[in-house]
Regions:
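Active-site mouth of glycoside hydrolases
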Residues: 30-215
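N-terminal pre-domain segments of enzymes
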Residues: 1-30
């Protein structure tokens, strides 16, 4: 007999479609992930396997209630790894655009540079990470993806920084300096909801220095 199953994007799966029991929460309970003989293992010797996808741009800074729902939804899908992708994206007005929210981006572009965090955006980012971790969802963290360098960043490009600038972060001295600064601030900042920095959190599986570095 054919039966209609309703799956709502804002609600966790239920019944036989709820795969959250497959996750081993909280993320990080078995220690850091490491490689051994071509496979992934946790520090305690348990084999590590991951299933996940991207959360991009403005989706990295949901409000607290939405963050809870997203974590529940992902866990119910059996997802145990989320890529925090393009959290450095510039602000944009359209919800469907490849951009951060105007009021709560991770990076604060308001002062004509891209060198500090927006307090509200950072709080949302931290809370989202904490909710994912609680559900047993691990993290892949991107560094430079869509960062839009501003005049105040003092880039050494005549007429301003070119588009799709991430490719230049491989060899441009000023960009390397700015990206080191960003990485240190992002990875060493202590999340008040977990009590750990990303650098010290075993829920972080991988850190990607440069997105699509050959693009």
């Amino acid at each position: 007999m054919r039966q209609h199953l309703r799956i709502h994007k804002a609600e966790p799966n239920k019944g036989i479609l709820d795969y959250s029991h497959l996750l081993d929460a909280p993320a990080g309970k078995h220690g850091f992930v490491e490689t051994r003989n071509g496979h992934l293992y946790f520090e305690d010797g348990k084999r590590a396997r991951f299933l996940g996808f991207n959360v991009a741009a403005r989706s990295n800074t949901p409000d607290h209630e939405t963050a809870k729902k997203m974590a529940e939804r992902f866990a119910s899908m059996g997802v145990n790894l989320i890529r925090l992708h393009a959290a450095d994206a510039p602000v944009g007005e359209q919800p469907g655009s490849w951009s951060s929210c105007v009021n709560n981006p991770l990076l604060d572009y308001a002062d004509g540079n891209s060198r500090k965090f927006n307090p509200e955006g950072l709080d949302r980012f931290d809370y989202f990470i904490a909710k994912l971790k609680e559900k047993g969802i691990y993290l892949h963290v991107d560094l430079i993806v869509a960062r839009e360098f501003q005049p105040g960043d003092e880039m050494d490009y005549p007429g301003g920084a070119p588009s799709c600038i991430k490719r230049y972060a491989i060899y441009n001295a000023r960009m390397i300096e700015l990206q080191k600064e960003y990485a240190k601030e992002l990875l060493c900042h202590v999340n008040p909801y977990t009590g750990l920095s990303l650098a010290d959190d075993p829920a972080v599986v991988t850190v990607q220095i440069n997105n699509e570095d050959s693009a």
